[in-house]
A protein has these predicted regions:
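Short gly/pro/ser/thr-enriched loop/turn and capping motifs at secondary-structure boundaries
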Residues: 43-46, 138, 174-176, 255-260
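Flexible, gly/pro- and Lys/Arg-enriched active-site loops
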Residues: 241-280
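Conserved histidine-centered catalytic loops in small-molecule metabolism enzymes
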Residues: 269-301
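Hydrophobic/aromatic beta-strand patches that form the interior of the parallel beta-sheet core
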Residues: 9, 37, 63, 167, ...
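Active-site ligand-binding patch in enzyme domains
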Residues: 80-81, 86, 90-227, 235-238
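Residues at the N-termini of beta-strands
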Residues: 35, 129, 227, 247-248
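Zn2+-dependent cytidine deaminase-like catalytic core
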Residues: 1-71, 241
Length: 301
């Protein structure tokens, strides 16, 4: 009753179908709002424009496009889920000034400094899943968890930190080498072409095609994993880059040189022409002591 005759501002079109909750548009009509200001239409084809039409039909004035770009930015994960049928994908890597991510022997701890690593945990806290390749899993035995305090995350001390689902891409040859990933009751998803035994908290997704990455991403979204952070090594990062399967790229660059014998981070096949290359849009630069963090959006997406 308090909103009767009021102006309502929303960043996304009010829903017009019943899913987990009743349609928002029906509630706005019921309580007789005066006008709706909407940032963007819902990209879901079942809703797109339908909620606005229902409001107009009920005699409610509507305005679409207020702060449109900001609203798209705010809802970028949802938009990607709806339009691409996959999670919003962030690629993350720490590199030297000469673009290396590890020494020849595989040593990579630590290229980035503690402040950069702390920042990367903030990114982990914003996604639904963290993905690494099987080689990285077996070589580094990572925990793939958010290791920050409630205070550092801006949470109340009694709030529970939501840990992302742990995701492994590829066949695991030495499961004993990944004990930290499988520790505790964390959910783990493994996507590969190989077979594996079923386990309590582990789901194995088996694929027939060699290039199953896109199908794997769709299956992750089907499991309500709406966003993932890819922290893989060269092979995994390049797989996503080659398939143009990413929305955001985060690079932490440390002030050091590791030399030509060290392992490259991004090493994809060169395009025949410059205009055929994957274009990025820089959206942010941050400094963590001597490390530089640069964040990019994929322009093609």
């Amino acid at each position: 009753k308090l909103i009767a005759g009021s102006n309502v501002y929303v960043n996304l079109e009010p829903c017009s179908i019943e899913n987990n909750t009743p349609p928002c548009s029906n509630a706005l009509i019921k309580y007789q709002i005066k006008k709706l200001f909407c940032g963007t239409l819902d990209p879901n084809p079942k809703i797109n424009g339908r909620g606005i039409k229902l409001l107009k039909k009920a005699g409610i004035e509507t305005s679409v496009g207020l702060l449109k770009n900001q609203c798209k930015e705010l809802n970028r994960v949802f938009f990607t889920n709806q339009k691409k049928s996959r999670p919003y994908i962030i690629l993350k890597s720490a590199q030297s000034l000469d673009g290396k991510i590890a020494l020849k022997n595989g040593e990579s701890k630590w290229i980035s400094n503690p402040q950069s690593r702390k920042n990367s945990h903030h990114i982990r806290s914003t996604v639904k899943g963290i993905l690494v390749g099987s080689h990285t899993a077996e070589q580094d035995n990572p925990s793939l968890t958010v290791r920050l305090t409630n205070n550092e995350l801006g949470l109340n001390k009694h709030d529970k930190i939501q840990q992302p689902v742990k995701i492994i891409l590829g066949n695991l040859k030495r499961s004993k080498k990944v004990s930290k990933i499988f520790a505790g009751n964390s959910k783990v998803i493994v996507g590969s072409m190989g077979s594996a035994k079923k386990s309590k908290n582990i789901e194995y997704l088996k694929y027939k095609k060699k290039n199953f990455l896109e199908e794997f991403m769709q299956d992750l979204l089907d499991r309500n994993i709406s966003s993932i952070l890819v922290e893989g090594g060269q092979k995994t990062l390049n797989a996503f880059l080659v398939n143009n399967l990413f929305d955001e790229l985060v690079l932490y660059t440390a002030p050091m040189f590791l030399g030509k014998e060290s392992k490259d981070g991004i090493s994809i096949i060169a395009p025949e022409k410059i205009k055929a290359s994957v274009k990025l849009k820089m959206i942010g630069v941050e400094k963590f002591k001597d490390d530089i963090k640069t964040t990019y959006y994929n322009k093609d997406i």
